[in-house]
Amino acid sequence: MQVENIRVRLPSGKEVGLVDALNFCYDISDTDFQVLKTLLNSGPKTEDELAEMLHLSKASINRSVNKLVSLGFVDRVKDSSSKGGRPRYIYKPIDADRITTKISNDFKYCADLFSSVIPQELKEK
């Protein structure tokens, strides 16, 4: 599944999109990004609902929501209507503004880190 997005032309001439940058910084795949966008646009969902909406396997959805939870973009809440057996979870995105701020801050942090090592790397023999 390819996520369509705005492309940015880098000084090298290469064009990259947001998913490329998210993949570099967070190891987020196209599928992970599609799951996040779906949750942001459609509200909290279970894995089953996401699998049906996105026409993906539950295993694929499970990997994506676990990645998004570990990164702090999505909260996992136990479904109170779940009776017996394995607990069901509902996945709820954090506020879109918080996600935007987190990603922007992390991009700035990464850029600053790379900028700080350039002088050292250029001087080393």
Curated annotation (Swiss-Prot):
Record's protein name: HTH-type transcriptional regulator lrs14
Function: Acts in transcription regulation. Binds to multiple sequences in its own promoter.
Subunit description: Homodimer.
NCBIfam families referenced in this protein's UniProt entry, alphabetically: trans_reg_lrs14 (NF040939)
GO molecular function: DNA binding; DNA-binding transcription factor activity
Keywords on record: Activator, DNA-binding, Repressor, Transcription, Transcription regulation
InterPro entries reported in the protein's UniProt record: ArsR-like_HTH, HTH_MarR-typ, Lrs14, Tscrpt_reg_TrmB_N, WH-like_DNA-bd_sf, WH_DNA-bd_sf
Record lineage: Archaea, Thermoproteota, Thermoprotei, Sulfolobales, Sulfolobaceae
Gene3D superfamilies: Winged helix-like DNA-binding domain superfamily/Winged helix DNA-binding domain
Keyword Iron-sulfur belongs to the record: no
Pfam families: TrmB (PF01978)
DNA-binding region as annotated in the record: 19-38
